[in-house]
Amino acid sequence: MKKYLFITFLSFLLNSVSLAEHANEPYEPNGWDKFLVKGSQNYYKFQSELVEDKDVKKEIDNSQKTGLISYLLFEDNKIKIDQENLPNYIKINNGIMPSHSVGKSLVSYVLGHAICEGYIDNINITLDDWSVLDGTLYKGQKLIDILNMNAGDQKFIGERKFNSDNKIQDVRFLNVNTFPIKDAMQLDILQSTKKSKPVYNYNALATNLLMNYTIYKTGDDWEKLLNKVFNEHVRVKDEVWFHQTVQKYNSSIHPRETGRYSFYANRYDYLRIGKRILDDWNNDTCTGKYLKTIYEQRISKNEKSYDGDRMGQFDIHTYSKKYGGQFHFDVIGLKKRKILGMSGFGGQQVIIDFDTGRIIVVHALDRHYNWKKIVLKKLKQK
């Protein structure tokens, strides 16, 4: 019990800036230690054939109300819609914007590369070789069940039972995004736990587990792998990074197991990521095979309602019926189409339609834009 109190109190003191409700997450691209990847000199160059879209323009022009600050639509191998109204504080940071939970999907994408590079055998392995999980319900589970948010952890964390995806049993200062995962797993509240009946349960701990397991398996090659994914494979133009769970002044205390899914990139590099995923799928690369495998093993969300969130707002998260490998699938009304969705707090969206070759990338300060009009309507076009 003393250990539990000490760790949680220390976490509260060191990370008080970021322990507000998830809905009030501040813009802080440089406040935390990073796993940083530099831009490629051979970055992917887009072609454009721009058209004006009145619906998108209206939402962008009214960004103070809608929250929409960036919209990109890519199809026919060209950027067709490109509109933005970035605040100055984002512009002076080279247009860098947070992924929020879009980063969950990017962790999976990196994990797929780790499998392709031979660091991890496959998605069906059992997690019995990592001491960090000792004593917890996660020890001995299959990797695919963690990928699918299907680990039977709903009594302890997640949106199935609690009001947050990142706080253990909804306790404000037990935010798994703000202290190393080994510390989280050693808390009394997670020790000697048993899994419940598996059910889709969206939460941040599963993703941070995946990321730190990948760090563990890659060892000294972790940042080399990140460079291979984003610099060499995606060919980003500018710096991108994952935040760590420790702030800069505190990073030396925890040299390992500090991975978290919070990702930063500019708008065009998010599109480059989407384009690379589209190409992986279409060209049946090793990573493309990974994406197809998690698509085949996706599970039902079994939500009571698909009528938006508690505020009546929609996105790919709330308007899709299945989940696989940290991605949203089976958009309502389009379930026959192979559409992969990434979704983050505040309306961040990266959506890839493998059947049409269309990619939509959206960034917002909050989710009050008309998602059905500027995203879903575009997806329905053939």
Regions from the language model: what does each represent?
Residues 93-94, 159-247, 261:
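Catalytic-site signature segments of enzymes, centered on catalytic residues
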Residues 236-238, 243, 248-250, 255, ...:
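Active-site Gly/Thr loop motif
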